[in-house]
């Protein structure tokens, strides 16, 4: 499914500002789900900060999916390396992790038409995170792991959002109406 979400090269006022956050630019940083919404912005922030990014994507040969990352890399001081990675295949991130000091895990299934939420979303997200963390255990250079999530984990059928001040969802909010 092609996402219509804004990408970092689109005309959109959003940025990942890494100023003040200690990032060792001498070691690569791996980003899973680098073609996704959050992964793309994190990749852009790292490249803008001069970091070498090992971007794990489903298929680095799919030029339509990685074109925006290549455009960002052309204009940033950092260096981009694309790697194939499959959330559900153990060991598929090992090559991308090699030599990295930080792993930022943003990859997760995001499907709008879900037939079986446990099978289609929860199980692959858990297995994918386990696979990434198992890779970290095998990679001595990794000293930090950042796990991310999405508004999709908290925002279900929009009932909960009505009670939040200004209908703004923050880290203090939790989805109490959705279920599997």
Q: How does the language model describe each region?
A:
Residues 3-27:
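A short, basic/flexible loop-to-alpha-helix module at the beginning of a structural domain
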Residues 22-56:
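N-terminal Rossmann NAD(P)H-binding glycine-rich loop of SDR-like oxidoreductase domains
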Residues 44, 48, 71, 134, ...:
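Short, well-ordered alpha-helices that flank and scaffold nucleotide-derived cofactor binding pockets
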Residues 52-54, 81, 146:
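A structural signal for isolated positions on well-ordered beta-strands in alpha/beta enzyme cores
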Residues 55-57, 61-65, 154-163:
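Juxtamembrane interfacial secondary-structure elements that flank transmembrane helices
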Residues 60-64, 68-127:
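NAD(P)H-binding glycine-rich loop region in Rossmannoid oxidoreductase-like domains
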Residues 105, 109, 114-180:
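Conserved Rossmann-fold NAD(P)-dependent oxidoreductase catalytic core, especially the SDR/UDP-sugar
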């Amino acid at each position: 499914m092609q996402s219509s979400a804004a990408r970092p090269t689109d005309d959109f006022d959003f940025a990942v500002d890494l100023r003040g956050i200690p990032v060792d630019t001498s070691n690569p940083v791996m980003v899973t789900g680098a073609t996704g919404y959050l992964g793309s912005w994190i990749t852009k922030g790292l490249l803008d900060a001069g970091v070498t990014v090992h971007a794990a994507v489903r298929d680095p040969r799919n030029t339509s999916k990685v074109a925006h990352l290549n455009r960002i890399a052309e204009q940033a001081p950092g260096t981009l390396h694309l790697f194939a990675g499959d959330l559900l295949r153990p060991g598929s991130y090992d090559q991308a992790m090699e030599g990295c000091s930080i792993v930022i895990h943003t990859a997760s299934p995001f499907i709008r038409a879900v037939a079986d939420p446990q099978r289609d979303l929860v199980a692959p997200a858990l297995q994918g995170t386990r696979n990434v963390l198992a890779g970290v255990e095998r990679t001595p250079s990794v000293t930090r792991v950042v796990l991310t999530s999405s508004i999709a984990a908290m925002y279900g059928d929009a009932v909960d959002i009505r009670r939040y001040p200004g209908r703004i969802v923050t880290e203090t909010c939790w989805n109490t109406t959705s279920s599997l």
